[in-house]
Amino acid sequence: MKVAILESIIMPAGHEVEFDRILVDELVQQGHEPVMLVPEKFPFKIKYNAKTDYLDGGEVVTYAGANKFEKLFLSIKREYRRKKWFDSAYQKSIENNYDAIIIPTSTYRYIRSLLKTDLKNSNIPVYMIFHGINPHEKDNFVKQARKCMPYKNIHLKVITLRDDFKNDGLTNVDLIAPPVFKPLDLPVDKELTLKEPLTLGFFGQYRREKNVRFFLDAFKKAKFNIPVKLIMQGATARTEDSEEFDKIISEYSDVPGVEFWHKNLIGPEWQKALLGVDVIIAPYAAERYRYHWSAMSFTAIGFYKPILQSPEMNPEVLEHFNVGEALALDSVDKFTKQLEKFVNEYPDKRAKYKDDLAKANDIFSHERLIKSLIG
């Protein structure tokens, strides 16, 4: 099949870019011909293994650097162009003989726009992907999904581990599992080889409101039976955050086994850092991650790393797979005891983590994603 991936969002390098790469590479793997279908002058962040077709209707509209009032104007402009792109996609599908169109990052606004364009009458399947629907969005999503039901070639695919639509009677909505994120061209230790010291990796952007001292105090107090190392990365964007992280480094410089990385990790460097630890600590997650899939959680699975994670972060994963634990964040003492127990029992539980990471990688595979999208 010739499958067009209609991408109209300019994204920084991150999991959105990687999601498009997953689609392209797995479509190729399964014998399809992917095509990137994008607005004119689209600034690709990476090179995809696909040819590119361009939409009529103008360039991508971004909010970068815009103030509150400018964003209001730009949102209207973006909506107008989105409808132009969808009309153009309808024409391109005929001219270029596409067999299907995938819109990889959609919202209810995309459905609303699509219903005002020729694309709703597409003769080929149009698969709109939604990366989770939170309670605040649900009513709007259901309203637009119902309006879309008469158009039988428009398929709404919600990536989720929940079932929040069972009573809504939406025959055009399918719930599909998220895919894992895997390293590119780097070996993965699927055996979870036991090494000394056991290395815990705490990665991410640091902001002053994040209470990393909580975790450092717990690590400092913990009594471990095996050698342990904690790598704490702090990627900082603001001067005040950078100064505060430097202060933390100074305060905890005498704690044995703690290594601070005050730097950004991008691309291969990020992947090597994740592959270089034994366990990932991901303590921060907003409530929305109960409804939207967490890139960090599915990166840990794809990299075969057990995870100590925020309780809000896709709890269904830990309910079905023994790949880590939800963090006890009530107090430093409580987390200290959890950390001690987790680390000290790791050598004995490693085999179970290994088995369940393999099972999770199968359930959340790229192959299953494409088959759940286009059959």
Regions found by a protein language model. Give the residues of each.
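N-terminal strand-loop element at the rim of the active site
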Residues: 11, 32-77, 108, 235-241
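Nucleotide-sugar-dependent
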Residues: 282-298, 310-312, 316-317
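Nucleotide-activated donor-dependent transferases that construct or modify glycoconjugates
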Residues: 1-14, 201-202, 281
